[in-house]
Amino acid sequence: MSFSPSFDALVQALTCLSGVGKKTAQRMALDLLLKKNAEAATLAKALTTALATVQRCRYCRNLSDAEVCLLCADPLRNRQQICVVETPADVIAIEQATDYRGLFFVLMGHIAPLDGMGPEALGMDILDDRLANEAISELVLATNATLEGETTAYFLAELAAKHGIQATRLAYGVPLGSELSYIDKQTLHHAFQSRDHYHEL
């Protein structure tokens, strides 16, 4: 039963968000309309502004308000390193959790031939040009630990080798606080393959 077509339209629009089903969308819509009218207006304005302003950086393809993003424009970044990730969310995660201070390149996906996602769709031509014309010494492969991510990492490693650039892959390991008996076989296998000299945390 529908009591407001506008409310229904808002609920339907909210379900486009990742992980948001109809029930959650209904709660969000009610919260916005009944409790937080001013905040809802601020949200609507911020979304409208972001849709009109945010674009992809011409160098790294990350989200940016300008032609060149803040990370690429930062003179303090290590310009000899490029970390290749699948999404802007990966950039945020690395920036928040590590001391990496090189540059990034965002693929906006991974190689998936069945979905029509080949190297060209991921901006590999832009990356190839950068590797050819910039003084890059290391390409950090930070794609996901999935079949598609590994396929993409392999392609990237070949691209780096073509330009005589070192390619490094993020190590896989056992998460802190976990028990070995609960770790999947692939993670445990990679953890053994990537083992290093012991040092205190």
UniProtKB/Swiss-Prot annotation:
Signal peptide: none
Keyword Manganese carried by entry: no
Role according to the record: May play a role in DNA repair. It seems to be involved in an RecBC-independent recombinational process of DNA repair. It may act with RecF and RecO.
Toprim domain sequence ranges: 80-175
Species name: Dichelobacter nodosus (strain VCS1703A)
ZnF C4-type: positions: 57-72
UniProt-listed GO biological process terms: DNA recombination; DNA repair
Keywords: DNA damage, DNA recombination, DNA repair, Metal-binding, Zinc, Zinc-finger
Residues spanning the membrane: none
Stated family: Belongs to the RecR family.
GO MF terms, alphabetically ordered: DNA binding; zinc ion binding
Database matches in InterPro entries: DNA_Rcmb_RecR, Rcmb_RecR, Rcmb_RecR_Znf, TOPRIM_dom, TOPRIM_RecR
Domain of life: Bacteria
Gene: recR
Protein name per UniProt: Recombination protein RecR
